[in-house]
UniProtKB/Swiss-Prot annotation:
Reaction equation(s) it catalyzes: 3 propionate 3-nitronate + 3 O2 + H2O = 3 3-oxopropanoate + 2 nitrate + nitrite + H2O2 + 3 H(+)
Alphabetized GO MF terms: nitronate monooxygenase activity; nucleotide binding
Keywords tagged on the record: Detoxification, Flavoprotein, FMN, Monooxygenase, Nucleotide-binding, Oxidoreductase
Cofactor(s) in the UniProt record: FMN
GO biological process: response to toxic substance
UniProt miscellaneous comment: P3N is a potent irreversible inhibitor of the key enzyme succinate dehydrogenase in the Krebs cycle and electron transport chain. P3N has been shown to be a toxic metabolite to bacteria, plants, fungi, mammals or any organism that uses succinate dehydrogenase.
The family this protein is said to belong to: Belongs to the nitronate monooxygenase family. NMO class I subfamily.
Protein name: Probable nitronate monooxygenase
Keyword NADP included in the entry's annotation: no
Record-listed FMN binding positions: N69, Q171, G176, G213, Q232, I233, G234, S235
E.C. designation(s): 1.13.12.-
Cofactor: how bound: Binds 1 FMN per subunit.
Keyword Repeat: no
Length: 347
């Protein structure tokens, strides 16, 4: 049993990725934790009240450790009005947006969620999109909470360790959903997972977790061999029975292959990997002109919600990683974890 597994008394070196947007509710996270892996709740897009409700619910479903993921606000000021106007004209239903969440409101939301993690003594807190502020890190570490950072390069991983993270998740470019990158990129700098793991494992003194494109036990075995102490998986859990993902989202993943996904900024203003649909194809020429996150995300929210209600995959954000060809049927969390952790996995 390695250091990562010992921290949480795990029997399986797996983290269920904290996928925001209502996918990873307590039912999924608790099912994962109850099978000896680390379940995750995603606080992104939840109000503090809803997060507290979900924390209470998961404690009713499991006594095992789980983590809560928190988006670190980027603190970007509102874009120019003419840019906003242009996108309002191009995005269905975007004219319903009369105001945006202020930077101060984002930080208030962040600290309210940190307070809930402290209040309920949650075992682990992970961060995405940036380095967490030092005061939050200090409070959480003083309370004995294990801190997990997200990085897409060795440089980012080292900064996460320096900030006080106990574990760093290495997100390869194959990963579905939003990129955790937070340093300015130098051209096309998305690093693949197999190149990232050994370099980061050599450079860091804390455990590293591999994330991106892994679907079966061969990927888990490869990541552990290269120096990771665990593996974080999203797409394979997204299609499990216990997942709250939209049925259309699940079906599109089961039908797709590795060439059907791409990185896009169109839905949120931040790079995220998803299955290509009509909205992405029709607006591809605007990829470099989107509003920054979270402003673009706010403008597309009503469109995405309506598409979800109408089962219209062409305007939904169908996040998925590059390993999806191997996903062919909806199974239970228990079945998936048994497949991921076969007997030849050496920990």
């Amino acid at each position: 049993m390695n250091e990562f597994m010992k921290k949480f008394s795990l029997t399986k070196p797996i983290i269920q990725a904290p996928m925001a947007g209502g996918i990873t509710k307590p039912r999924l996270a608790s099912a994962v934790s109850n099978q000896g892996a680390l379940g995750s709740l995603a606080s992104g897009y939840l109000t503090p009240d809803l997060l507290e409700q979900q924390i209470k619910e998961i404690f009713e479903l499991t006594d095992a450790p789980f983590q809560i993921n928190v988006f670190v606000p980027l603190g970007l000021e509102m874009p120019p009005k003419d840019q906003i106007k242009k996108w309002k004209e191009n995005i269905p239903l975007a004219n319903q947006v009369n105001q945006f969440t202020s930077v101060q409101e984002e930080w208030d939301d962040f600290y309210q969620k940190i307070d809930l993690i402290l209040k309920y003594k949650v075992k682990a807190c992970s961060f995405t999109f940036d380095l967490p502020p030092e005061d939050a890190v200090k409070e959480l570490k003083t309370a004995g909470c294990c801190l997990i950072g997200t990085a897409s390069t060795v440089e980012e991983a080292l900064l996460m360790e320096e900030r006080g993270m106990d574990i760093v998740v290495l997100q390869g470019s194959e990963a579905g959903g939003h990129r955790g990158a937070f340093l300015p990129s130098k051209g096309e700098s998305a690093v693949g997972l197999m190149a990232l793991i050994p370099q980061a494992a050599d450079a860091l003194s804390v455990p590293v977790i591999a994330a991106g494109g892994m679907i079966d036990h061969r990927g888990v075995k490869a990541a552990l061999t290269l120096g990771a102490q665990g593996v974080q998986i999203g797409s394979a859990f997204l299609i499990c029975h216990e997942s709250n993902a939209h049925p259309v989202h699940k079906q599109k993943i089961l039908e797709a292959n590795e060439a059907d996904t791409k990185l896009t900024t169109l839905f949120s203003g931040k790079e995220a990997r998803g299955i290509v649909n009509k909205w992405m194809e029709e607006n591809e020429q605007f990829e470099t002109q989107t509003l920054p996150y979270p402003y673009q995300n706010t403008l597309t929210k009503a469109m995405r919600q309506k598409a979800s209600l109408q089962n219209n995959h062409d305007q939904m954000s169908l996040w998925a990683g590059q390993g999806i060809r191997s996903l062919t049927e909806e199974i239970s969390v228990k079945q998936l974890l048994n497949q991921l952790c076969q007997e030849d996995i050496k920990i």
